[in-house]
Amino acid sequence: MVTIQADEISNIIRERIEQYNREVKIVNTGTVLQVGDGIARIHGLDEVMAGELVEFEEGTIGIALNLESNNVGVVLMGDGLMIQEGSSVKATGRIAQIPVSEGYLGRVINALAKPIDGRGEISASESRLIESPAPGIISRRSVYEPLQTGLIAIDSMIPIGRGQRELIIGDRQTGKTAVATDTILNQKGQNVICVYVAIGQKASSVAQVVTTFQERGAMEYTIVVAETADSPATLQYLAPYTGAALAEYFMYRERHTSIIYDDPSKQAQAYRQMSLLLRRPPGREAYPGDVFYLHSRLLERAAKSSSRLGEGSMTALPIVETQSGDVSAYIPTNVISITDGQIFLSADLFNAGIRPAINVGISVSRVGSAAQIKAMKQVAGKSKLELAQFAELEAFAQFASDLDKATQNQLARGQRLRELLKQSQSAPLTVEEQIVTIYTGTNGYLDSLEIGQVKKFLVQLRTYLKTNKPQFQEIISSTKTFTEEAEALLKEAIQEQMERFLLQEQT
């Protein structure tokens, strides 16, 4: 028979009394009234904040978006198939935030900053709010440093500066993503961190972009945030803000970053879906009234930090798809009004074999030559005007039967200028190579060649200059100016290469 020892029992009771903690924990809970289509309506959750994360019984997380008098509208970050009517929900007291660290470089993640590339977890000690306020006026300075894209047409005539927001707009299949990916490839060795956000894209397209980055060694300074077409609308809506939070982390650490949103119109469609299901009143094209704010609060986060904050920068390149060239639709006009200029890609030019299919006439950068090095300004200053005059003359020449010699010469020069702007995909050029190309065209050195020979000659000239006149590149990179010495070296190289080229063509 077991003997009961009173002193042992009393000791245990005393210990328990001493360990007893009278802490009262208040949990804000609610009950699921209705769930479906990625939306849940919750009764209760009286003190929930707008945008607060809520947790369902079976582990799904949601965001409280609609705070109504008798229920709360929650959008789900998952399929929500296991959520049942009547199950409990608790408020977490947190606004959506993600972990941030250097460890994200070279990784492919989703909108919740979870890796989806099968390479294990990412360690991070800090976190940032997904939606943080944009820098104020005092925290910024004007854009003055160039962000080189490696594309002659952009860097010479529609320059992009670090901290600028430049829209890339055009119909489907006109090479918009190619312009953005070439820009990322060109940042190699430039100390710029790149973030590529794929919103509602095909998984195969995203995989292709990631493969290109890996093959070209661009993943070491790039983060890919991907929410493909089969992702829930909530995650497609959040993905751009996640990308912006990661880019901001580096910007506030005095680094230069570039972020590509591909594309915000898909984010707007996801937001429209969520809003309509939450029974928010529809506006133009059935978008909710705050769809402008959706994009403005995202793009305003791009900035050039003031010297007090370390002069970091975040350059935003949103990509918007138009329907048969209609830039007056709701989302394109909204994004055009928010950004500092746009690069317009034309389906007609693309089909005519002019690639990148940039319509230089209606593309514009509101930062302008402030985002160019002096050498580029010296060489490319007049090229946009010359091309515009050529386009006008070409349209007129279609109706004229006989043209005088001067007009014929101007047309021939224009055709060669247009030819030198053509570039293969994933073949960005350095600033020095671009200066060589533009100078050769604008100063008439290509006029004696056939149009079909222009590209071949320029490739050979750039190679010849690199091997035989390395001083040219040194002068441009050190002084950032097209000096008389540099011009003399270039003229010499053009003449020498032209003689070699013509002999080569004759044989």
Curated annotation (Swiss-Prot):
Topological relation to the membrane, as annotated: Peripheral membrane protein
Site (Required for activity) residue list: S363
Catalyzed reaction equations: ATP + H2O + 4 H(+)(in) = ADP + phosphate + 5 H(+)(out)
Subcellular localization: Plastid, Chloroplast thylakoid membrane
The keyword DNA damage is assigned to this record: no
Predominant location: plastid
GO terms, molecular function: ADP binding; ATP binding; proton-transporting ATP synthase activity, rotational mechanism
InterPro entries in the record: ATP_synth_asu-like_sf, ATP_synth_asu_C, ATP_synth_asu_C_sf, ATP_synth_F1_a_nt-bd_dom, ATP_synth_F1_asu, ATPase_a/bsu_AS, ATPase_F1/V1/A1_a/bsu_N, ATPase_F1/V1/A1_a/bsu_N_sf
CDD domains found in the cross-reference section: ATP-synt_F1_alpha_C, ATP-synt_F1_alpha_N, F1-ATPase_alpha_CD
Keywords, ordered alphabetically: ATP synthesis, ATP-binding, CF(1), Chloroplast, Hydrogen ion transport, Ion transport, Membrane, Nucleotide-binding, Plastid, Thylakoid, Translocase, Transport
Family: Belongs to the ATPase alpha/beta chains family.
Function as written in the Swiss-Prot or TrEMBL entry: Produces ATP from ADP in the presence of a proton gradient across the membrane. The alpha chain is a regulatory subunit.
Subunit structure: F-type ATPases have 2 components, CF(1) - the catalytic core - and CF(0) - the membrane proton channel. CF(1) has five subunits: alpha(3), beta(3), gamma(1), delta(1), epsilon(1). CF(0) has four main subunits: a, b, b' and c.
Name the UniProt record assigns to this protein: ATP synthase subunit alpha, chloroplastic
Species of origin: Buxus microphylla (Littleleaf boxwood)
Gene: atpA
